[in-house]
Every structure is written in C-alpha cells, then in structure tokens.
Amino acid sequence: MKIGIIGAMAQEVEILLGYMAEPKLTEIAGCKIYEGKINNTDIALLQSGIGKTAAAMGTALLLQLTKPEMVINTGSAGGLDANLNVGDIVISTEVRHHDIDVTAFGYEKGQLPANPAAFMANEQLAQIAIKETEKAGFNAVSGLICSGDLFVNGNDMIARIRNDFPSVKAVEMEAASIAQVCHAFQVPFVVVRAISDVADKESHLSFDEFLPLAAEKSSEIVLAMLNNFA
C-alpha cells in the first residue's frame, strides 16, 4: 500500500520528511515529491506550494506519477468553530470551495459545474484520524473545511463565509482543490490540519507565530495514522 501525503509549505512537510528513510526527490513544475518509507509504509510526500492552483497541479502529478491508494492532506488552518483554539485539530467530513459562485446558473455556493457541491472525505480515514487525535489527547473538531485563494483575515470576510457555509469549522487555501482532484481520480482522501490561527483581524500575526506548532501537531497525527496501515 502506498499513501500520498500533501502539505503546501516546507514547514508543513519537513517533520514527516525527517521520518522518511532514503527519500527520493522528484521536482516538477514547482512541486516536490518525496518517495520513501515511513514506519514501513510506502509514502509519496508532496510539497505542493500555496493556493488552490498549486495544490490541484501537485495533486494531479502525485496521483499520476506515484499512484497512491489514499491521500492525507496535512498542515495548518484557520479556525472558524467556537470550539477550536490554536493547536487544536480539525478533521474533514467534507470540503468545499468558499470563493466560487456560479449560483446564477442554479448551482450551490462553492459548486463548480460537473462537480458535487461538497467533496466527501473517506469515512474510514476520518475515523482513524479522530481515533488517533483522541489517543494523543488533542482537542479536535470534525466537519466542513472550506478553501479559497485568500487568507481569511477580517470580520467582513469571516461573516461572508459563515453566512454562505453555516457549518464551516475551518478555512485554508488548498484542501478543496486536493479533494476535487482526488474525486476525479477516485482516490479516497481526508484532511487533517492543526489550527494556526483563529480567523479574526489579528489572524495574520497568529499564523506567523503558531505555524510551527500547527505543523508539529498535524504531523504527529498523520504519523500516528500511518501505524494503522503498516
């Protein structure tokens, strides 16, 4: 079994890379794909770059070149749920785009033509993530994660997203595109991210300060998940 793991930034993949035995690097179109073993499991680890286009391009390359049987998206996110604080874990049950609007043609907010409104995470993977988060003693929330090509920072932006997607738990900039590509390739996925900032007007300051903590927490859960497939 081979598992694909995707993070946008170097900080979000470097801890996992440190556990990989003799990684083989492929660089293509700005993406870095590391192949090797972690805990005796074959892993293809992608550093995609930031944003939905980079994530989609990288995910397609990962799936086409390395053929993983499942995908875990790791990294950081901004918390929109009242029960989430910096360092907590958010696990996807579904993922949607929050910056797409073709409702004039009868689609739901965030839905693209020829695609579902929500990309559903694999239930088994989500349950494994929840189990390992509980074992680690971390606070976690599962539910809707929304993605857009903007850093959510400010009350007006937060109000719009909450109005359009009342059940949203967290926001970030890649997961919906990763999920969309996985949907097209029929590869199961889950998003497991740690909260680096609680989305408000100071979230950009919190993100810079707490990104290392978020990377550490999310990587710990992903590593624990891998033990279920060894």
Swiss-Prot record:
Pathway assigned in UniProt: Amino-acid biosynthesis; L-methionine biosynthesis via salvage pathway; S-methyl-5-thio-alpha-D-ribose 1-phosphate from S-methyl-5'-thioadenosine (hydrolase route): step 1/2
Residue positions binding substrate: G78, V152, M173, E174
UniProt GO cellular component terms: cytosol
Keywords: Amino-acid biosynthesis, Hydrolase, Methionine biosynthesis
Enzyme Commission number(s): 3.2.2.9
InterPro entries tied to this protein: MTA_SAH_Nsdase, Nucleoside_phosphorylase_d, Nucleoside_phosphorylase_sf
Catalytic activity: S-adenosyl-L-homocysteine + H2O = S-(5-deoxy-D-ribos-5-yl)-L-homocysteine + adenine; S-methyl-5'-thioadenosine + H2O = 5-(methylsulfanyl)-D-ribose + adenine; 5'-deoxyadenosine + H2O = 5-deoxy-D-ribose + adenine
GO biological process: L-methionine salvage from methylthioadenosine; L-methionine salvage from S-adenosylmethionine; nucleoside catabolic process
Pfam families (alphabetical): PNP_UDP_1
Principal EC category: hydrolase
Taxonomic superkingdom: Bacteria
GO molecular function, one term: methylthioadenosine nucleosidase activity
Catalytic residues, chain numbering: E12, D197
Function text: Catalyzes the irreversible cleavage of the glycosidic bond in both 5'-methylthioadenosine (MTA) and S-adenosylhomocysteine (SAH/AdoHcy) to adenine and the corresponding thioribose, 5'-methylthioribose and S-ribosylhomocysteine, respectively. Also cleaves 5'-deoxyadenosine, a toxic by-product of radical S-adenosylmethionine (SAM) enzymes, into 5-deoxyribose and adenine.
NCBIfam families in the record: MTA_SAH-Nsdase (TIGR01704), PRK05584.1 (NF004079)
HAMAP family recorded: Salvage_MtnN
Family: Belongs to the PNP/UDP phosphorylase family. MtnN subfamily.
The name this protein goes by in its record: 5'-methylthioadenosine/S-adenosylhomocysteine nucleosidase
Species per Swiss-Prot/TrEMBL record: Glaesserella parasuis serovar 5 (strain SH0165)
